[in-house]
Amino acid sequence: MRRMIIAKLHNVTGIMNRFTAVLNRRQVNILSITAGVTESQDLTHTTFVIEVDHLDEVEQIIKQLNRLIDVIEVADITDLPHVEREVVLIKVSAPPTIRAEIFTMIEPFRVNVVDVNLENVTIQLTGDSAKIEALIDVVSPYGILNMARTGSAGFERG
């Protein structure tokens, strides 16, 4: 099952290594990691999306992570009201003969077109994972030439 774990960490060298080492030792599949400084330059907000078999695994992982030096707080926000966003850049094969059709297909997603040339277009979308997967499904038949995803970032609402 997919779980979203957020962590507030001291912004120090090596903390991400120690954090991911715990996940590695428990053989947890990491689907995405995003990290960045917060409103305080001393702190890093990190979002991990992981795949686990059982919910009790997540509880054990969180307990282990909270024991690490330089970890302030770790929480599983999957079942809580939360905001989650991801960015994707997709370069799609778009020769002039089908470009209008492609633009019609992607319009409902409110994508941003960030580059256009004679044979392809590059689009950007911000949304949750489901919205991004839906866009990928729509443009795949036209030919995805390149794609880069940021991974999910999120935090609790309220």
From Swiss-Prot:
One of its GO terms (molecular function) is acetolactate synthase activity. Pathway: Amino-acid biosynthesis; L-isoleucine biosynthesis; L-isoleucine from 2-oxobutanoate: step 1/4; Amino-acid biosynthesis; L-valine biosynthesis; L-valine from pyruvate: step 1/4. Its EC number is 2.2.1.6. The keyword Nucleotide-binding does not apply. One of its GO terms (biological process) is isoleucine biosynthetic process. Residues 4-79 form the ACT domain. Keywords: Amino-acid biosynthesis, Branched-chain amino acid biosynthesis, Transferase. It catalyses: 2 pyruvate + H(+) = (2S)-2-acetolactate + CO2. It is an enzyme of class 2 (transferase). One of its GO terms (cellular component) is cytosol. InterPro entries: Acetalactate_synth_ssu, Acetolactate_synth/TF_NikR_C, Acetolactate_synth_ssu_C, ACT-like_dom_sf, ACT_dom, AHAS_ACT, AHAS_small-like_ACT. Dimer of large and small chains. Belongs to the acetolactate synthase small subunit family. This is Acetolactate synthase small subunit. The gene is ilvH.
